[in-house]
């Protein structure tokens, strides 16, 4: 028998992107294992973790990928984005430069990923309110202008981490399930599904046999 963790209705690949040090790895570990590591070092290469959630009675298995934000690891981008249906674009609310770089990350994402990818802008480290360098309203306005959803999180104290992943996975599920319904409707209406078979009764007359419309 298979592992229960292997039983799912949908598998969605979601990537974490953003500058190094914004807390991508801790967002991943908080959501998938409910862990936080203050000594977390920069991720080298690529790693991913999985967790399943329920949406509308369906089991959604999220495969969440994390990679280092440093420029020297950019060689992995094409493989990293391949097959991704969602992305969390993360910045640190206490470091304005990480927010300034969001635009560059967004461009890279749109250059490499599927055009229909669902993107959420995430302002992480909301627990550092006293050090805030990026106003919430400014980030929200940027997200709205670029068609992104937006949330502020804290991997340290768990604030909104669950909500961020649940929101993006639910949005992906809605899009995928609506597309499946639309495809089914189109399939039901296609000519091949509307063929009415015509039965010609056999005749006893000795007429030459003709094959007509055999391939229709």
Curated annotation (Swiss-Prot):
Control of this protein's activity: Regulated by guanine nucleotide exchange factors (GEFs) which promote the exchange of bound GDP for free GTP. Regulated by GTPase activating proteins (GAPs) which increase the GTP hydrolysis activity. Inhibited by GDP dissociation inhibitors (GDIs) which prevent Rab-GDP dissociation.
SUPFAM superfamilies registered for this protein in UniProt: P-loop containing nucleoside triphosphate hydrolases (SSF52540)
Protein name as annotated: Ras-related protein Rab-11A
The encoding gene: RAB11A
NCBIfam families named among the record's database cross-references: small_GTP
Region (Disordered): 183-208
Chain positions listed as propeptide in the UniProt record: 214-216
Any one biological process term the GO annotation gives: melanosome transport
